[in-house]
Regions:
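Cytochrome P450 core scaffold surrounding the K-helix E-X-X-R motif
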Residues: 27, 156-158
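Hinge/capping helix and adjacent helix->loop/strand transition within the periplasmic-binding protein
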Residues: 8-14, 28-115, 164, 174-192
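Conserved helix-loop-beta element of the AMP-binding
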Residues: 42, 68, 143-156, 173
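Paired acidic/hydrophobic, glycine-rich loop segments that form the ligand-binding mouth/hinge
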Residues: 13-19, 80, 126-130, 145-148
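Adenylate-forming
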Residues: 3, 24-28
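Beta->alpha turn/N-cap motifs
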Residues: 18-23, 112-113, 130-135, 150-152, ...
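Short helices/loops that flank or line small-molecule/ion binding pockets
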Residues: 2-11, 96-100, 114-124, 128, ...
Length: 192
């Protein structure tokens, strides 16, 4: 609703939109999305971005992403995994990993990162794909253990954590981002 209202706002520089990656994904999920992310907005800045993380409980049998993938290949449909919700960038990243790795695993979409993380902590799912910021505290405290991330190359804040590309899964590179946008048509002098 808010993104649609921003898209319809007068292009006078008084309305700005701060949105997550969802603003790009939503039109592919909702047939009647009230905006087009390319046509209706002028990008101003990326405010931040970080990769998604594939994480397990510390006592998980999977020491690496390769261990998890090998088990999943040998045991189709035996593993279940969580994302914050269907259609989120973590969900899409997890699906790309599943498809590119050729594994059959069951996705469980939750109603936000909080419930998905709680399910992981409670052992209700085998692994979680979530935005790094959603699991940062659990990773640092040892409540969850990261197997891989969806960024490109090694990350400065997690230099020992491999990317999924390092396991031969290419095309799954994705970040969850936060962007600042204006309605299309705002004059350039107003934007600068």
């Amino acid at each position: 609703i808010g993104i649609g209202a921003a898209a319809r706002a007068a292009p006078d520089g008084y309305t700005l939109l701060c949105s997550s990656s969802a603003f790009v994904v939503n039109p592919s999920l909702y047939r009647n999305a009230p905006y087009d992310p390319v046509r209706d907005f002028a990008p101003l800045s990326t405010l931040g971005a970080s990769p998604n993380v594939l994480a397990v409980r510390p006592e998980s049998r999977f020491a690496t992403l390769q261990d998890l993938l090998d088990f999943a290949r040998a045991n189709p449909d035996r593993l279940n995994w969580a994302s914050p919700a269907t259609g989120t960038t973590p969900h899409l990243a997890g699906e790309i990993i599943r498809i590119r790795a050729g594994v059959k695993v069951q996705h469980i979409g939750y109603t936000g990162a909080g419930p998905a993380v709680q399910a992981a902590l409670a052992g209700q799912i085998d692994y979680l794909v979530a935005h790094q910021g959603s699991v940062e505290q659990q990773l640092r405290s040892g409540q969850l253990r990261a197997l891989a991330h969806t960024g490109t190359g090694r990350q400065a804040d997690w230099p020992d954590l491999p990317s999924v590309a390092e396991y031969g899964i290419h095309g799954a590179e994705s970040d969850t981002f936060l962007a600042l946008l204006a309605p299309a048509g705002v004059p350039a002098p107003v934007l600068t």
